[in-house]
Regions:
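Amphipathic alpha-helical
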Residues: 1-10, 154-198, 245-252, 260-262
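Charged, flexible boundary elements
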Residues: 2-31, 36
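A short catalytic or substrate-binding loop motif that flags glycine-/basic-rich loops and adjacent residues
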Residues: 27-30, 37-41, 175-176, 195-198, ...
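Short, active-site-adjacent segments that bind or coordinate small-molecule cofactors and metal centers
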Residues: 181-185, 265-289
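A short-motif feature that recognizes glycine-rich, charge-decorated loops
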Residues: 228-264, 269-274, 292
Length: 296
């Protein structure tokens, strides 16, 4: 079993399937039957077992088996009758409040907080038994892992719903009970639905595209102090008329900089005097790229 290749293929296929929506876009969910689960704010890791050898890794083969050995041992025991399997799960920190991504990072780095870590499994990547539909996978996971979140490892609870019920569950789970979001899926599509948030950020630079006299994207940051700016991301989802207006303003503010940043199309950012603040709409802040490498 080629574990690394299987995980990368899975991540690529799942990433293409995911459709991110805000709660104002729930009507986009196509008609049909779905499985709904609460979205946990953690990190994606994979439990991999080949013959008698097992480990917990991510798509870059970073291995945390020794850090969360108790979770691995529990999974080894629960899956003792399974020879080859790869499970996808969300590593999260179980607390009285809503779990946070930062708590997961802290738990991996601080031994005293590690006891709070849990692996909530939500999918079967590969198994000895052919499991073609999510319904079959979920039954397998419930039977072998159970749904008790007090266990170190468990299957994330899913419920079957109609598309017309998504908004009702969003209000109950996310708005009322402060969950990060919802995952709504069937065998054709996976929707990630979250509350839309806004952030006021400095425009720190821009790139140019093939169209003259308009920007392609902007880089964004926040002041740490009077002399330092923290880069927090980039944005290219900008209306055409605003691209033209920003071009006129930003080229006048261009400055020389020792800091370099390359856009996804390979062009270098031009940096400017940090004088313009803009409001950005977003669904989430990410610390990692889709390949699990940290965003720098």
């Amino acid at each position: 079993m080629d574990i690394t290749n299987s995980i990368k293929k899975y991540k690529n296929s799942v990433t293409r399937k995911y459709i991110s929506l805000s709660n104002d876009e729930i009507d986009v969910v196509t008609k049909g039957d779905y499985w709904l689960s609460r979205k946990y704010d953690g990190q994606l890791w994979f439990y991999c077992k080949s013959n008698k050898n097992s480990k917990i890794i991510n798509s870059n083969e970073n291995d945390i088996s020794t850090l969360i050995s108790d979770i691995k041992k529990e999974l080894d025991k629960k899956l003792s009758n399974t020879k080859n399997i790869i499970l996808a799960g969300e590593l999260y920190s179980l607390t009285k409040e809503r779990e946070r991504y930062g708590d997961t990072i802290s738990g991996l780095g601080d031994k005293s907080k590690r006891k709070n870590l849990r692996l909530g499994v939500f999918d079967v990547v590969i198994s000895d038994k052919l499991l073609s539909s999510f319904d079959e996978k979920y039954k397998f996971l419930k039977k072998n892992l159970g749904e008790n979140s007090k266990d170190l490892s468990h299957v994330l609870e899913h419920k079957q719903i109609k598309h017309s019920d998504v908004n009702k569950h969003f209000k109950e789970i996310v708005i009322k009970n402060n969950a990060e979001g919802l995952i709504v899926r069937n065998d054709s599509a996976v929707y990630k639905i979250k509350k839309e948030e806004t952030a006021d950020l400095l425009i720190t630079g821009y790139t140019l595209g093939k169209t003259p006299n308009q920007i392609r994207s902007i880089s964004l940051g926040v002041f740490l102090n009077e002399n330092e700016i923290l880069h927090v991301g980039s944005c290219g989802n900008i209306p055409t008329n605003l691209r033209k207006d920003l071009y006129k303003k930003l080229v006048k503010l261009k400055v020389n900089s020792n800091f370099q940043k390359i856009a996804s199309n390979g062009s270098a950012y031009n940096f400017i005097k940090p004088e313009i603040v803009c409001e950005i709409k977003l669904l989430e802040f990410q610390g990692d790229k889709s390949n699990d490498e940290p965003i720098r």
